Amino acid sequence: STSFSVVDLIHPDDEVTQAKTDGVAYRIVERGTSDHTIDQAFKRMAIEAGATLHYKSRIDEKDADIVACGPKDTSALALGEIFRTSHPNHIAFQLNDKLAPGAYSYLIIIDGVGLICTCLWRKQKKSERFLNECIATYQRLYPDIDMEPIKRVGGKGDFTLNGFYPVPEPGQHFVGESGGLQDFMWGFG
């Protein structure tokens, strides 16, 4: 993980203020398929403990010891662009309905790789335009950030506080979003 003690908070009028602390305010943990990510560390630990992972196949939930499926419904959409940069580590967060209707956008730069992302609470017509406008806004607010695009990414999410969660079979565990566990601030499983 990478520790941060400051975050830029970008107001809807593009004023930038900073929230800071003398200690560690938060840590960013990288997800994904690269060997050094938390996902792969958990995968290695599970396999070493004897777990069998099922990819691109469907088994009945009642036959699984651990149920760790992502969201079944979609109430949120995330669109982003990953890029290379020489800019130092940096985090910025913005609430602006013009860039992310009903939600938020953010900029993360860690160790030479950046991500600008917009989150939308529902699919919008021409959703990609919100990402393009986000990128243009962050480039205007941070003109010293050089960006060499790598790829565009996207995902879906769902957030509910009153969803139906089945009673586990004996010895069965529901984890993450399958277990109803969500970050109450941002809704991540």
Name each model-derived stretch.
Residues 182-189:
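A conserved FAD-binding loop/helix module that cradles the flavin
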Residues 36, 40-153, 157-171, 180-181:
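Predominantly flavin-linked oxidoreductase catalytic cores and closely associated redox partners
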Residues 12-15, 106, 172-173:
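Short hydrophobic/aromatic-rich motifs at helix boundaries and adjacent loops
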Residues 32, 124, 186:
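Flexible, glycine- and charge-enriched loops at secondary-structure boundaries
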Residues 175-177:
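Active-site flanking residues adjacent to catalytic metal/cofactor-binding acidic residues
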Residues 1-41, 49-51:
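A conserved beta-strand/loop capping segment in the N-terminal third of enzymes
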